[in-house]
Amino acid sequence: MAQLSDLEIANLSKLKPISEIARKVGITEDALEPYGHYKAKIDINQIQEQEKKGKVVLVTAMSPTPAGEGKSTVTVGLADAFNKLNHNVTVALREPALGPTFGIKGGATGGGYAQVLPMEDINLHFNGDFHAITTANNALSAFIDNHLHQGNELGIDQRRIEWKRVLDMNDRALRHVNVGLGGTTHGVPREDGFNITVASEIMAILCLSRNIKDLKEKISRITIGYTRHHKPITVSDLKVEGALTLILKDAIKPNLVQTIEGTPALVHGGPFANIAHGCNSILATETARNLSDIVVTEAGFGSDLGAEKFMNIKAREAGFDPSAVVVVATIRALKMHGGVAKDQLQHENIEAVEAGLVNLERHVNNIKKYGVEPIVALNAFIHDTPSETACVKQWAKDNQVRIALTEVWEKGGEGGIELANQVFDVMQEPQNFKHLYELKQPLEAKIETIVKEIYGGSKVNFSSKAQKQLKQFKENGWDEYPICMAKTQYSFSDDQTLLGAPNDFEITIRELEAKTGAGFIVALTGAIMTMPGLPKKPAALNMDVTDDGKAIGLF
């Protein structure tokens, strides 16, 4: 019998009316804004603030293969397992971006029998949040160019406009463009460019805001560029923060959906973890904490990216601590980090598994540096052999690391019971959570701390441009912001071919970006791009739609 695709499994699943899912966690009709039968937004003003809030479980991973290691799948499956054990639980995830869906991923709502539904809706447009963010971002670009055209009262230096347009698509041809061409009636000519929507500062702001008032305040602080005398120009100078917030008034509301097994799921926001902070919205997580005893959430890519930013940016801004952290590992990723070529990962190779464990070990040790005990979820794949699995379990035993074989892709929540029990045990223990660095440290010291403590590097080199920016940012009073590293997800270093757990390498910061609205400084390393490109054979080639409107090819 042929193995069913994720989309086929999703289509065979019976969804419950969204009102029934809402009642399960105490969401009243007044707070529920349905988008059809199976999706809704939540009016956060109608959610009662609880004195005792739910505990947060963070799911992260080891350094992934290009196909990913099933972190979203494990996150959903763990929540379903808690549900099976009769715990009051909600899962909180990021929204998928269209670009990667059509590029390499083909979708991002979990997999197998651990998915959030309706899968095709969530992967394609969902409730319109990304379109609203794209519109708000590009409206700001239009306001900037109009200001230049109408006389430039603020004295904006058109060579130093930092704000770029965005599109929710992987489109390398738009990285560098010229705008305002065609004569004086068409605007002021200048160089511009596009980022992908998930890299927009407005995406980060929406995910770090607590309410509309906070959203507007953060938007007003966005630095869009500089004058010829290097004075920062903000959105508040343009006086358009109200208009931009108006565009986002519905997008800020968390989205309610469900898993295959009927566990409530809040899916909201979607910044990438390699070029942004990689976590779902604070509002969704806090709403889930007010509704449930346990909130299972994830942060993008490995512990060096999404989890580091969760700990030092999101948790700091939101004011909560994770009660447990799950590190997802797979046999195939261990073999890749042990030196096996990507086209040979399906073959048994105990030596490669043993060699690749250094990568997992560093991720486990990274989590311990935050004062939280990690639990390894060994996410089972069809080509794993008993000997390879036993090898990983023996390593965990020898190193006193909690581990659970996780089979949620195949079995849904039932395949995550062992993991749920392990996580619940850790949640009952006192954790000594701490941030990696203090905000009062200089920017370069915070960057060096991340590189040395989390990545295993020995030195940070700053380009001449980055050195000038460090000086300027300090003069502007921006040196107490947290750091958001932009780095490859495939390696601890800034070289994606350097696998395993490299030591004594150097990382170069080529450029810094001040996200004064979101409240962090982005440090760009290596060849990281904020507008990805499509692969030679994008996933879109396998996608279609039937005559009656059913999706084909999402996975």
Curated annotation (Swiss-Prot):
ATP binds at T65, P66, A67, G68, E69, G70, K71, S72. It catalyses: (6S)-5,6,7,8-tetrahydrofolate + formate + ATP = (6R)-10-formyltetrahydrofolate + ADP + phosphate. It is an enzyme of class 6 (ligase). GO terms for molecular function: ATP binding; formate-tetrahydrofolate ligase activity. Pathway: One-carbon metabolism; tetrahydrofolate interconversion. SUPFAM superfamilies: P-loop containing nucleoside triphosphate hydrolases. Keywords: ATP-binding, Ligase, Nucleotide-binding, One-carbon metabolism. Its EC number is 6.3.4.3. InterPro entries: Formate_THF_ligase (IPR000559), Formate_THF_ligase_CS (IPR020628), P-loop_NTPase (IPR027417). The keyword Acyltransferase does not apply. It holds the Pfam family FTHFS. GO terms for biological process: tetrahydrofolate interconversion. CDD domains: FTHFS. NCBIfam families: PRK13505.1. Belongs to the formate--tetrahydrofolate ligase family. This is Formate--tetrahydrofolate ligase. The lineage of its organism: Bacteria, Bacillati, Bacillota, Bacilli, Bacillales. The gene is fhs.
